Regions:
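Detector for methionine-enriched segments
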Residues: 1, 15, 51, 101, ...
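N-terminal single-pass transmembrane signal-anchor helix
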Residues: 1-23
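Membrane-proximal N-terminal amphipathic helix
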Residues: 24-54, 60-61
Length: 245
């Protein structure tokens, strides 16, 4: 009886660890698959359009060293920028975006097998569930700042991903959230947040939710890089996952 009791205690202690390790392996393999599929899809869309696509950030960063000239008094994030030498930022400071609309149309309509598209209102229309949290919610929980709250209207905030941004569900369950709205020419940002296992749990940043950024030059899109807006406790950054492939 004592032996059985000891075995039971050991099992109770080790099972959660084993389960957690198994989940990490499963999610790591899923990340590899989705990163590969997403990358191949991007380059396939570019090849099918048969031209160097201008929809990326520069491979080597901005064209000048940018400095902030005005901060938001409420959220303390930068509102306006200029080059360090005082000159204004050029329209292509961060990259070239002229072809983003035609590229995304090719990517999501002719390359990826999309089973559901939400132009906006992703939560109400079923592309996302209530379990998803925006980066502002995650950051406020992990690093609360009573003096300056996190901006609820910036990047992949809760309001943006659930109400304002476009989302797609692919045939394998993968969820893709665009930074901004599909075919919005006023805001062409080649950045995409991807839930690698769809609506399945854990639905956490740094576990199964990661952000990809397209990088390139005047010769077209060259690279799919990681970009990190948030990583929940115990999770990994997108770059860590890419390097751990």
């Amino acid at each position: 009886m004592i032996t059985l009791g000891v075995i039971g205690v050991v099992a109770a202690l080790t099972m959660p660890v084993i389960t957690e390790n198994v989940q990490k392996i499963v999610l790591k393999n899923q990340f590899k698959k989705v990163y590969s599929t997403f990358s191949q899809g991007v380059f396939q869309a570019q090849n099918q359009l048969d031209m160097p696509i201008a929809c990326s950030y520069w491979l080597n960063g901005g064209l000048c060293e940018a400095v902030c000239t005005e901060y938001d008094p409420v959220y303390n994030n930068c509102k306006t920028w200029q080059c360090k030498d005082g000159s204004p930022l050029s329209a292509d400071h961060n990259g070239i975006r002229e072809d983003c609309m035609v590229f995304e149309e090719e990517l999501f309509n002719k390359v990826f097998k999309v089973v559901k598209f939400c132009e906006d209102n992703a939560l109400a229309n079923g592309c996302l569930t209530s379990e998803y949290r925006g980066t502002d919610k995650v950051k406020a929980e992990q690093n609360p700042n009573p003096e300056y709250p996190y901006n609820p209207n910036s990047a992949f905030s809760d309001t943006n991903i659930k109400n304002n941004y476009s989302s797609w569900i692919l045939s394998d369950g993968t969820v893709i959230i665009k930074y901004g709205k599909y075919k919005d020419t006023s805001k062409s940002v080649p950045v995409y947040t991807v839930d690698i296992n769809g609506h399945k749990k854990p639905n956490k940043w740094g576990y199964d939710i990661f952000t990809f950024q397209l990088k390139g030059d005047k010769g077209g899109i060259k690279k799919i890089d990681g970009l990190d807006y948030a990583s929940e406790k115990g999770g990994k950054t997108t770059m860590q996952m890419i390097q751990d492939k």
